[in-house]
């Protein structure tokens, strides 16, 4: 199945503690059907000191969200579903609300 959400897409969170927050997708975990969104769903992780990080301590990092809990933001700033259509000889993604082609 083609990816409806890709790295770099601007998305909004639909459910959970960060509902309504927007951010860019930094990573897509295809097998787990999850995405990492920049600045959203932050969790605290306790890390040991290492040579790379001699300080250690409590660090904040993004946790993955299920793809069903995020939606792409269209050009008007509203969440939209994604469809596919053929333009010429290419398959492209488009926003169902506006019909505009999504870059990427």
UniProtKB/Swiss-Prot annotation:
It comes from the Bacteria. One of its GO terms (cellular component) is ribosome. GO terms for biological process: translation. Coiled coil: none annotated. One of its GO terms (molecular function) is structural constituent of ribosome. Keywords: Ribonucleoprotein, Ribosomal protein, RNA-binding, rRNA-binding. The keyword Cell inner membrane does not apply. Pfam families: KOW, ribosomal_L24. The keyword Transcription does not apply. HAMAP family: Ribosomal_uL24_B. One of two assembly initiator proteins, it binds directly to the 5'-end of the 23S rRNA, where it nucleates assembly of the 50S subunit. Belongs to the universal ribosomal protein uL24 family. NCBIfam families: rplX_bact. Part of the 50S ribosomal subunit. This is Large ribosomal subunit protein uL24. It comes from Caulobacter sp. (strain K31). The gene is rplX.
């Amino acid at each position: 199945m083609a990816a409806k959400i890709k790295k770099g897409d601007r998305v909004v969170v639909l459910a959970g503690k960060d509902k309504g927050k927007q951010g860019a997708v930094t990573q897509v975990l295809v097998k787990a059907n999850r995405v990492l969104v920049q600045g959203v769903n932050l969790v605290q992780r306790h890390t040991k000191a290492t040579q790379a990080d001699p300080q250690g301590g409590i660090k904040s990092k993004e946790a993955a969200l299920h793809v069903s809990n995020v939606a792409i933001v269209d050009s008007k700033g509203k969440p939209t579903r994604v469809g596919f259509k053929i333009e010429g000889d290419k398959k492209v993604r488009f926003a169902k609300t506006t019909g505009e082609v999504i870059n990427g």
